[in-house]
Amino acid sequence: MGDIMIDWFFHTLKSYPEIAIFLSLALGYYFGSFTYKGLGLGAVTATLIAAVIIGQIGITITGPLKPFFFLMFLFAIGYGVGPQFVRGIAQDGVPQAIFAAVVCVFCLLAPYVAAKIAGYDVGSAAGLYAGSQTISASMGLATDAINRLGLSPEETKKILDGMPVAYAVTYIFGTVGSAIVLALLGPALLGIDLEAACKRYEEEYGGKKQLGGPGTAWHQFDVRAFRVRERGPAVGKTVQEAEALIPDQRVFILRLRQEGKIVDATSDAVIHAGDVVAVAGRRDVLVQLIGEQAEEVDDRELLAMPIEGVDVYVTSKDVDSKTLEQLAKAPAARGVFLRKITRGAIAVEIPILPNTKLNRGDIVTIVGRTPDVAAATKMLGRPDRATDMADVAFIGAAIAIGALVGAIVYKIGSVPLTLSTSGGALISGLFFGWLRSVRPTFGRIPSPTVWFMNSVGLNVFIAIVGISSGPGFVAGLKALGFGLFLWGVVATTAPLILAMYVGKYVFRFHDAIVLGCCSGARTTTASLGMVNDRAKSQIPGLGYTVTYAVGNTLLTIWGMVLVMLMT
């Protein structure tokens, strides 16, 4: 009975390969979710392993399913990093963008040299590159390039079957090793006390302007009611003059109770002894403003103000590249406090310091009275309202346009050159992602949808690759041997060590962000998390967003370039 059930199961998977794909995804996402100290296989590697095991029974998958999901994935990658990529190329992120490009060259050359020395074929070399640099997306472009080599179908399949083998063997150290090299070895090799460097960075960029810890006046606040005593420092002053008594702190007088009546605190309203004032700010600073002998009052009616928090998508060119300190002086910023700033495709949290610059495409969480929040939102951009509706017409048109452009073949002499449909979809994503950050009236793709296109798009592609190469996987692993793992260690480690020294001594990045720049250029999010943990700060993330955008793009394209170098 058991044999009959197994035979039926295998026969069903062969007859309906879509079931095998979903089964690979289920197993991959489940086992990929397990981590130890923040490190694990991840969904991509776990899906590949599950697909290879399932593929041992010999399942054939045909049709456009694989390129369909891969194009969707590449577009999502470009769409997510587009604003940071363009900023890095065109504006104030140029040093970090150039650094990322240099690191990407190291990341290409190390596995290329390793593959040449080891004598690997082009498929194994592409897998070695993808695994050691943890850039799964490159396998799609490498596959396109290999298919265009003009080899026989049998030889092409043999080469392509070697790619997932090399990827699976080298990916684990590519992930774990990168985190170890950057977070644990990096500070020692560079002679950096990471925690002290981050504190130094905060002081240099405005952190000491805040009492009670760097940045706290920007996002830690309370609203209290105080009675103004005789001869208090605010007596006889207008609201604007009273708020200016402590220039380095964000303190706002919101309402007044004068002669029993509640009035809004306009900038020219005069404060008198005996008034009850509703003030927003840190409590120790509030007492300093009103006077040491200030009497706190439980005036619930005065304090009953509508307070709201809003996520704002920054689109205004008037605030682009402005520091928080500059923006705080704008009338529209009065009465508003920052809770959080996130940036980039993976929503890296940016430290809140007076000299922190806002960029178009950032999402800032602001809190304050409803009218104050509305004014600040208008100054910054527009509310980033949650929605479950994606502009599918835009997605389809954008991917189609990119793929059409990529399909064009350019001839230089007798040499045909093409971006391929994959490269076209990636570039389309970059362009339209940037365009939406400056013209957010179209092309809405909610973050969960971008995640789905990114994650599921890649993993369906990986599942099909694994299932198709399953029968030849074991034979390929035996042929490549343990030496492949060691070459993967070399290909992972060498570029990172070079990157750290180049970042510190050639580009002269601040000690607090140099490892974040290296993490971004290698697109290794696990490393950034470990670096932040070592630093006990979010400061290293300031070096991550631009380098990640450039690195993610170039490392993906390198999959095609590596095939050209190997042939």
Swiss-Prot record:
Mind telling me which GO cellular component terms the entry cites? plasma membrane
GO molecular function annotations of the record: monoatomic cation transmembrane transporter activity
**Zinc listed as a keyword:** no
Q: Which UniProt keywords apply?
A: Cell membrane, Membrane, Repeat, Transmembrane, Transmembrane helix, Transport
Q: Which PROSITE patterns match?
A: RCK_C (PS51202)
UniProt-annotated location(s):
Cell membrane
Domain (RCK C-terminal): residue spans on this chain: 211-295, 297-382
The record's annotation in InterPro entries points to: AAE_transporter, Asp_Ala_antiprt, RCK_C, RCK_C_sf, YidE_YbjL
An example GO biological process term is: potassium ion transport
**Membrane topology summary:** Multi-pass membrane protein
**A Pfam family this protein belongs to?**
TrkA_C
Query: SUPFAM superfamilies per the record?
Result: TrkA C-terminal domain-like
The yes or no answer to whether the keyword Hydrolase is present is no
Ranges that cross the membrane:
15-34, 41-63, 68-90, 97-119, 170-192, 392-409, 413-435, 455-477, 481-503, 540-562
Family membership, please give it. Belongs to the AAE transporter (TC 2.A.81) family.
Q: State the protein's name.
A: Uncharacterized transporter bll3476
